UniProtKB/Swiss-Prot annotation:
Record annotation: effect of changing Y140C: In a lung large cell carcinoma sample; somatic mutation
Keyword list, A-Z: ATP-binding, Cytoplasm, Kinase, Magnesium, Metal-binding, Nucleotide-binding, Nucleus, Phosphoprotein, Repeat, Serine/threonine-protein kinase, Transferase
Localization (cell): Cytoplasm, Cytosol; Nucleus
Function, in words: Constitutively active serine/threonine-protein kinase that exhibits growth-factor-independent kinase activity and that may participate in p53/TP53-dependent cell growth arrest signaling and play an inhibitory role during embryogenesis.
Region called Disordered, residue ranges: 1-28
Annotated SMART domains: S_TK_X, S_TKc
UniProt-recorded name of the protein: Ribosomal protein S6 kinase alpha-6
Residues of the active site: D198, D543
Cofactor field: Mg(2+)
Native source species: Homo sapiens (Human)
Mechanisms controlling activity: Constitutively activated by phosphorylation at Ser-232, Ser-372, and Ser-389 in serum-starved cells. Does not require growth factor stimulation for significant kinase activity.
Gene from which this protein is expressed: RPS6KA6
Record-linked PROSITE patterns: AGC_KINASE_CTER (PS51285), PROTEIN_KINASE_ATP (PS00107), PROTEIN_KINASE_DOM (PS50011), PROTEIN_KINASE_ST (PS00108)
Signal peptide boundaries: none
Amino acid sequence: MLPFAPQDEPWDREMEVFSGGGASSGEVNGLKMVDEPMEEGEADSCHDEGVVKEIPITHHVKEGYEKADPAQFELLKVLGQGSFGKVFLVRKKTGPDAGQLYAMKVLKKASLKVRDRVRTKMERDILVEVNHPFIVKLHYAFQTEGKLYLILDFLRGGDVFTRLSKEVLFTEEDVKFYLAELALALDHLHQLGIVYRDLKPENILLDEIGHIKLTDFGLSKESVDQEKKAYSFCGTVEYMAPEVVNRRGHSQSADWWSYGVLMFEMLTGTLPFQGKDRNETMNMILKAKLGMPQFLSAEAQSLLRMLFKRNPANRLGSEGVEEIKRHLFFANIDWDKLYKREVQPPFKPASGKPDDTFCFDPEFTAKTPKDSPGLPASANAHQLFKGFSFVATSIAEEYKITPITSANVLPIVQINGNAAQFGEVYELKEDIGVGSYSVCKRCIHATTNMEFAVKIIDKSKRDPSEEIEILMRYGQHPNIITLKDVFDDGRYVYLVTDLMKGGELLDRILKQKCFSEREASDILYVISKTVDYLHCQGVVHRDLKPSNILYMDESASADSIRICDFGFAKQLRGENGLLLTPCYTANFVAPEVLMQQGYDAACDIWSLGVLFYTMLAGYTPFANGPNDTPEEILLRIGNGKFSLSGGNWDNISDGAKDLLSHMLHMDPHQRYTAEQILKHSWITHRDQLPNDQPKRNDVSHVVKGAMVATYSALTHKTFQPVLEPVAASSLAQRRSMKKRTSTGL
């Protein structure tokens, strides 16, 4: 089934729900909708919030472990802010986990109502008990006279709400992954006797790989067993189950209704029950029929119907998570692999080095982190939070981290603000390379004296946002250059990366008098594996010339190879500018878009073929030297003729020649993909390749000049796309719209 067409701002749209007796159908915003006849639960009028009696606090601090205090944490950035507290990115300064990054939730006691104080204590108690791969972990909890502190996992991926509303188109298969992980997380809480009660996208975070982490337990309630019910009125109204709205008492089954709301929203971009105000929304939850989008698969519609049962006893999940797991919608989920985090997530967040906050709202991250002392609370406040402090039992064993020193502390990436200028942090040195839109220089970090490279891009000539995002998202791959810092002074953008001290790959190869097939195969394997990774993620490099493949260090080992300079790289996007997941690409993208993407990917492979040829032959396939004219080179490329005989070729294996001929095939559709390269016997059996090294003449300067001439000719021939300013994209325009307020802090 074709997924829901994305709107400009799907989270803010309201879905009309048809009223009246019997089933009916119609269209909402051009989409076919069918009213679902829904069973009637016990309707009751909606009440205002009153005084709620919460359960007593019974947990106490674990003894025998070092207690934490605010002085042990270095404030780095503000991640979020609410009416009674902030969430900071912090770095631990002492102890066995020195250098580790955490999220620190700081709550002012004086600002908390009694209800909120008990919820905060409850959140701490619940987190102490919980240990699950898809639930955020509490590492420390402590208090001062005026504040409460929760030290939690720092999840670099941000929240699912941000990802969904701003960047990505998901398919049913993608949504299924998140829902399956979420089902396991909810089940774990339910087995502990905990009702979550506040399930919404803002409370589902992503780690740097893309797995979920459920967070924010301030509204959760522990119950003794399944028969016990809670009666408090809490949660985000659009996600409330009918029994929560009418206050007839609710149990863990209420979470599965909210789970259905989340599923509906992730699949359609709209909420199933949303009125013009709070009261109308609650009345719709109690009485309205569900408008079921007909573009959803039969399995998805079936699961939604079974989750949206107003009688909690009839709701799927009321008898436990196995009911959910057995539903046909999840038929292809391997639950054991999923729990072990062995299933690849559909989307990798754009998070570079460990302390990046790229996925968090710049409204907060641009602020200077400051934890004010906080007014003392009332005299009995400390008594209320007695036993609040906690230290995770495994803290010493879990972190085998080198204590932090000035040598390994680097500044925080300046993506979302100009807290520091480039010149204040780094000292510029000599040029490394000069291009049409940028210059690359060596630089030295002022504090640590460490060497880096900086690419300085003129914003008036090129929009660097796509390059930055790609490096943020994929720069943690071992063979892709790592982005360390980003600065923007208005005219120029400074991209600080590792300094490639080993130099260009081709230079190192040409300087060797001898070079074996086994060495060439090792190098081609590493590069092809990296390119395959990028292509599988919908990223094409489009400028994979030898000067952009370098060695990280002087060892010149294959593992130290890095693909650099993503200035021409592109991520696959829909017409509205949203990123497309690999699943979306495979199923729903227009053929002409895929053809362009396939053409770009084939160009990457052709470039690898030119490099491969030169590694084996000691000269380039289409240019004889630096003085060849562009017309001569392009004519040879156009004819697709290159020699595989004479000279060194007489000593090269047939397997190498076969692979090379497929990589340099004239027809992009018949040219090998990176995946096919990796499956070729010359790569898979590279340990059996000859290790003898045919001697070559030292003509490295001629070969290098010929290579430069080849790519210069291609540049003359090929029209390079002019990128519009990022502000002109639909994605940027959507981001500038008024954001929906989060209550998740």
